Amino acid sequence: MFTPISAHENTTSSGGCMAAFIAKLGVSLTLSLALTGASYAQDAIFADGFEAAVPATDALAARFLTQASFGPTKASIANLRSVGYEAWINNQIATPATLTRPYLAGLGAQGLSLSQRHRLDRWFHSAATAPDQLRQRVAFALSEILVLSDNNDALINDWAGVSEYQDILSSNAFGSYRDLLKKVALSPQMGKYLSHWRNRKSSATTEPDENFAREILQLFSIGLVWRNPDYSLITDAQGQAIPTYDQGVVTEFAQVFTGFANACPSPAGLCNRYSGLTSIFDSFAPMACFPLFHDLSSKQLFDLDSSPAVNRVILPAGPACDPAPAAGSALEQQCFAYCNNELDSVITAIANHPNVAPMLSHQLIQRLVTANPSAGYVQRVASIYSASSGDLGATVRAILLDPEARTFDPSAPGFGQPPNFGKLREPLLRITAFWRAFGAVPGLCSGTCLDQNPPPAGVTEVRMGLGSPQIEFSQRPLGAPSVFNFFEPDFQQPGPVAAANLFSPEFQILDETTSVTAANSIWDLVWSGYHGGSLVFTLPTRNAYFPNSEIDNFFLGNNAGMVDELNLRLMYGSMSGSYTAGNCAAGTGMKGVLYNLLQCQMSAAEQRRKVLGAIHLIAISPEFSIQR
């Protein structure tokens, strides 16, 4: 049973109510996600596909924004209901990316000594306030598929390089997946992370490193086994899964990823564009191929007995590029062209593989909507991916507007959703949800100054207060413990989830310890600016905080309205139970407990304690933790 109790619970008079709140609620996260018995009863407006132009209620708008952004706000709910789903998505796709590296470079130009902490503060600030919410949310999802991490000796101090990779993901979140794969393959930071940076062709003593070749196949594209468009397994005559590649295929791919390193600057100066013999290079531009170190042999890709002939690709041998031909000669140009064209052919072969559509569609659905999408849901999205030649914008649109994603009826058993629908909210998404719901702003800044690039003189840095979130939450933006992310898409929590053969990825980082550390950290984040049980506010200088204007006038003197609005902003109308205004004993479920706490356990003079205490209680509750 998930019953997190904060170690800080006695620092205010409401703290003693928290344990009772959680205990009385008594909801198992596992069962609420995995064992719902509801039948799939679509709302009438979805009977023949997605037909509703606009959300019918604020709650439906808030639920959509929970999936499509880092959390709904009062303004974003109103905007979505005004323009409708399609226009909202179109507007988000058209909104330019909020970038990280140029902003931090502007801070560095003022003499600030930067680190990964500044990158994290910028990430959290963008998640909480940036206008390109869908783009940033999809980029976050992609960062958990195309994993790069600062938890690596080569990148731990490279805040600028990791920021550049974040910008690659956000800038290309709605473009071609094939183009994004190429940018990832040529990222110097990815090259260092998965060791194809300065990877050399075979010699008498060495062979090409195979790390990136293996991961671009297993994790970034086709996966380990063949799948149908609906993500179901394709099996052989003995009923066994069929592998998509073997060691021989990895070896062939590894030979392609040789000769790539940091590009020469422009102008090249002393940098040799053919051999790369220099210490002068561009740290952020896509890696360039240096033909002297690129493998020139012929290569056979996907050459497995199980691979359909259409997927087999043979790359011819290259020209005589070693020793280096005369500078500027036709042969030198042929060598450059061979190296670059071979990479293009390989990326195209990967992107065109039929396994990419169901693999990527399934993972993006998991990150945005539900851990266990139906076969039909995956196939519908995969068909859009394939028909659009891997257009991520079209794919994300299909994910969000699919009938399975949009079906939700708070009054129906299981919300009228398919059996086993939903997912555990990722820890970072829990934080951004309550930050956005109540307009959190960073320390040291009034808000708008941080949107200028370069920042005006006198602006120092964004202070959101989460420099090491992996300690409390087991999650850190672009800081996974390995290339397999914080959790794996096919993780099955032991017990009822595994017995039902369901997936529960986010549960891989939830345990007794993180439940408590997360609850404690959320307390500190919600109560930022208050100390020692006092309701006197002191402006934080190192942490995000809720402006008093957001808290002091929030349904002042109207506890019923407060419960309803909290239910809307944080839980899109999904809060269980009911309450009877003015009657503390008649309530049921989470609504009843919360109303009783606000109406009967606190005085009207405790407005800040009411609002902040309620936000904290909801943020650590099992019902909030499950996204439905």
Regions found by a protein language model. Give the residues of each.
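Boundary at the C-terminal end of the N-terminal hydrophobic targeting segment
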Residues: 39-41
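Amphipathic interfacial helices
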Residues: 118-119, 129-137
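Bacterial N-terminal signal peptides
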Residues: 24-36
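Ser/Thr-rich, Pro/Gly/Ala-heavy low-complexity intrinsically disordered linkers and tails
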Residues: 43-52
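N-terminal secretory signal peptides that target proteins for export/translocation
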Residues: 1-22
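Active-site substrate-binding loop specific to GH73 endo-beta-N-acetylglucosaminidase modules
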Residues: 81-84, 93, 104-105, 116-124, ...
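Flexible, low-complexity segments enriched for small/polar residues
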Residues: 62, 66-69, 108, 146, ...
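N-terminal mature-domain "stem" immediately C-terminal to a signal peptide or N-terminal signal-anchor/transmembrane
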Residues: 53-98
